[in-house]
Curated annotation (Swiss-Prot):
Gene3D superfamilies: Complement Module, domain 1, Laminin, Plasminogen Kringle 4, Trypsin-like serine proteases. Residues 309-558 form the Peptidase S1 domain. One of its GO terms (biological process) is platelet-derived growth factor receptor signaling pathway. Converts the abundant, but inactive, zymogen plasminogen to plasmin by hydrolyzing a single Arg-Val bond in plasminogen. By controlling plasmin-mediated proteolysis, it plays an important role in tissue remodeling and degradation, in cell migration and many other physiopathological events. During oocyte activation, plays a role in cortical granule reaction in the zona reaction, which contributes to the block to polyspermy. Residues 1-17 form the signal peptide. It catalyses: Specific cleavage of Arg-|-Val bond in plasminogen to form plasmin. One of its GO terms (cellular component) is apical part of cell. Both FN1 and one of the kringle domains are required for binding to fibrin. Its EC number is 3.4.21.68. This is Tissue-type plasminogen activator. Belongs to the peptidase S1 family. It is an enzyme of class 3 (hydrolase). Residues 36-78 form the Fibronectin type-I domain.
Length: 559
């Protein structure tokens, strides 16, 4: 009887856990983990399980209430009213839920985040980067930054839960910031088994130009320019005639906006560019300032390639935002085919190789795609353009490939064509007298074949690292008696090893960029032209020498 009772008790124990079992039990396994998070793309914010938030409804003026449930975002519309106090930065419009205290910011173009505090067009930082509010999230080692709101940073001195986090630019994101006034923007990374700080690879804005030009929309511009597009002189921000205006030196946050006892151009509301108040025909109005954006050529958000392939490495378009893909309509069938690579050198102009256009295609049969990582798969931020015209160098020799350069003008209804973003940007043109040391390491990129015998182009953008050959090694003698002129330069992979491991351009890469880093900016040194095979040991690729064509480029761009 006792044995039977003991068996019954044991069975009950299996069926009904003891009261304190839950203290040590590990119940949270699988997909429904309490660590499940949700990503709200419009605000680029990550939310934890059961967190809720408001967000604007797409293509609607309504607002919806969202909740993170097991990794899924569940939303429904709710009534809202205007916020009782300003909570949004950079000209964002604040709306508050009618029956609870949460709010949502309707952000102007170029700004995202819970409070419109993230500037998606900021591609570099000024001075120490204390006011940098861009989206760079990569450390100098290539490590990805950790979200400032992560619980692993709760004991760190700088995290998104500090009382003054918003002022410091910290929030529910992993973008580089400089909250402690260090030398430049930094972030936390996981390294060698622990969480530590590391400077970011965010590029610095060109020095010496901050007084004459502005970066992004000019929200952080603090120069002394004070003339408008009509050459009118700006009114001081503390002028008595501005009483009652939204943006004056009397605002509580005027210092943060750059407003004060001066008449310098500013952009306190996140408008398209710096502006100021002026008097026109005895009436108070405002005008944009007569300023140009700073050059951000050659700047990028480089991501270290993860996959090695024949001839190079798979890469992302953000590492080579100047890379263009040129397509041409098929002659006898619908659709289009990939033609060549190209390189964006200004908003409306792309350089390529002359030999790509031997068939003299009508301009309306050509298309240029910018911002694409995969050759035939559209990218999220890609930009597509028809061609207004293209110019092949008048002295191009289709036998020797001398003067192998062409210039394509993108079609646009305005003077602005390509819009700068993390995926689209220009490469710098070199100085006329540029002479780089022999064996300087440079980069090329393109959608070409992995090897000469392959029947297919690469599905994804590749990059390769090569070194500039001395002129004494860039001769006919070293290239099997092929003609080599002073308009060409040579570059190749100088490492020892089998041919399969060597980096090089290949068929399909033609017209693409060979860029070298000069003063932390990627500068266009060559245009991919021709070669003997692909990735052969001690056989360099041949490139059009861009410094020889600067006058030709500028003259044709002015026409």
């Amino acid at each position: 009887m006792k044995r039977e009772l003991l068996c019954v008790l044991l069975l009950c124990g299996l069926a009904f856990p003891l009261p304190d079992q839950g203290i040590h039990g590990r119940f949270r396994r699988g997909a429904r983990s309490y660590r499940a998070t949700c990503r709200d793309e419009p605000t680029q914010t990550t939310y934890q399980q059961h967190q809720s938030w408001l967000r604007p409804m797409l293509r609607s003026s309504r607002v919806e209430y969202c909740r993170c449930n097991s990794g899924l975002v569940q939303c429904h519309s709710v009534p809202v009213r205007s916020c009782s106090e300003p909570r949004c930065f950079n000209g964002g419009t604040c709306q508050q839920a009618l029956y609870f205290s949460d709010f949502v910011c309707q952000c102007p173009d170029g700004f995202v985040g819970k409070r419109c505090d993230i500037d998606t067009r900021a591609t570099c930082f000024e001075e120490q980067g204390i006011t940098y509010r861009g989206t760079w999230s990569t450390a100098e080692s290539g490590a990805e930054c950790i979200n400032w709101n992560s619980s692993v940073l709760s004991l760190k001195p700088y995290n998104a839960r500090r009382p003054n986090a918003i002022k410091l630019g910290l929030g529910n994101h992993n973008y580089c910031r400089n909250p402690d006034r260090d030398l430049k923007p930094w972030c936390y990374v996981f390294k060698a088994g622990k969480y530590t700080t590391e400077f970011c690879s965010t590029p610095a804005c060109p020095k010496g130009k901050s007084e004459d030009c502005y970066v992004g929309k000019g929200v952080t511009y603090r120069g002394t320019h004070s003339l408008t597009t009509s050459q009118a002189s700006c009114l001081p921000w503390n002028s008595i005639v501005l009483m009652g205006k939204s943006y004056t030196a009397w605002r509580t946050n005027s210092q943060a906006l750059g407003l004060g006892r001066h008449n310098y151009c500013r952009n306190p509301d996140g408008d398209a560019r710096p502006w100021c108040h002026v008097m026109k025909d005895r009436k108070l109005t405002w005008e944009y300032c007569d300023m140009s954006p700073c050059s951000t050529c050659g700047l990028r958000q480089y991501k270290r390639p993860q996959f090695r392939i024949k001839g190079g490495l798979y890469t992302d378009i953000t590492s080579h935002p100047w890379q263009a893909a040129i397509f041409v309509k098929n002659k006898r069938s619908p659709g289009e085919r990939f033609l060549c690579g190209g390189v964006l050198i200004s908003s409306c102009w792309v350089l390529s190789a002359a030999h790509c256009f031997l068939e003299r295609f009508p301009p309306n049969h050509l298309k240029v795609v910018l911002g694409r990582t995969y050759r035939v798969v559209p990218g999220e931020e890609e930009q597509t353009f028809e061609i207004e015209k293209y110019i092949v160098h008048e002295e191009f020799d289709d036998d020797t490939y001398d003067n192998d350069i062409a210039l394509l003008q993108l079609r646009s209804q305005s003077k602005q064509c390509a819009q700068e973003s993390s995926s689209v940007g220009t490469a710098c043109l070199p100085d006329p007298n540029l002479q780089l040391p022999d064996w300087t390491e440079c980069e090329l990129s393109g959608y070409g074949k992995h090897e000469a015998s392959s029947p297919f182009f690469s599905d994804r953008l590749k990059e390769a690292h090569v070194r500039l050959y001395p002129s004494s090694r860039c001769t006919s003698q070293h290239l099997f008696n092929k003609t080599v002129t002073n308009n060409m330069l040579c570059a190749g992979d100088t490492r020892s090893g089998g041919n399969q491991d060597l980096h090089d351009a290949c068929q399909g890469d033609s017209g693409g960029p060979l860029v070298c880093m000069i003063n932390k900016q990627m500068t266009l040194t060559g245009i991919i032209s021709w070669g003997l095979g692909c990735g052969q040991k001690d056989v360099p690729g041949v490139y059009t020498k861009v410094t020889n064509y600067l006058d030709w480029i500028h003259d044709n761009m002015k026409q």
